[in-house]
Swiss-Prot record:
Antibacterial peptide. Affects Gram-negative bacteria. This is Hemiptericin. It comes from Pyrrhocoris apterus (Sap sucking bug). GO terms for biological process: defense response to bacterium; innate immune response. Keywords: Antibiotic, Antimicrobial, Immunity, Innate immunity.
Length: 133
């Protein structure tokens, strides 16, 4: 997918581009990439430019009739006019277990953790009950 945006007037303007692509996919693994870029200008100031490249991946680690464990990760680099490049990374895992399956729907319990570096550094945990009908 590619998305291009822009707007402008006599002395100012903005243009942005975003491209996403599935790089690899099979029944257990997916890998995708995203690239974004933008420029903006307003007289009498110099133009400002920024961009980002990101790689995301997920993999099913364990899967059976009732349980699924998925791992995920990302790597990202951001650049902007007048700034050093900024890199960030993250990994995570989520487990889902089906506790009820009937004609009115399904009930799952799930839990997951994620660790990110330089985004700023952050830990995240989540869990809950999911009802699908």
């Amino acid at each position: 997918d590619v998305e291009l945006k822009g707007k402008g007037g006599e002395n100012e303007g903005f243009v942005g581009l975003k491209a996403q692509r599935n790089l690899y996919e099979d029944d257990r693994t997916s890998l995708s990439g995203t690239v974004k870029g933008q420029s903006q200008w307003k007289d009498p100031y110099p133009a400002q430019h920024a961009g980002m490249a990101r790689l995301d991946g997920t993999r099913t680690l364990i899967e059976n009739d009732r349980t699924k464990v998925t791992g995920s990760g990302f790597a990202q680099r951001e650049v902007a006019t007048g700034m050093r490049p900024h890199d960030s990374f993250g990994v995570g895992v989520e487990a889902t277990h089906n506790i009820y399956k009937g004609k009115n729907g399904e009930v799952d319990v799930f839990g997951g953790v994620q660790r990110q570096w330089n985004t700023p550094d952050r830990h995240q945990a989540r869990g809950g009950i999911r009802w699908r009908f």
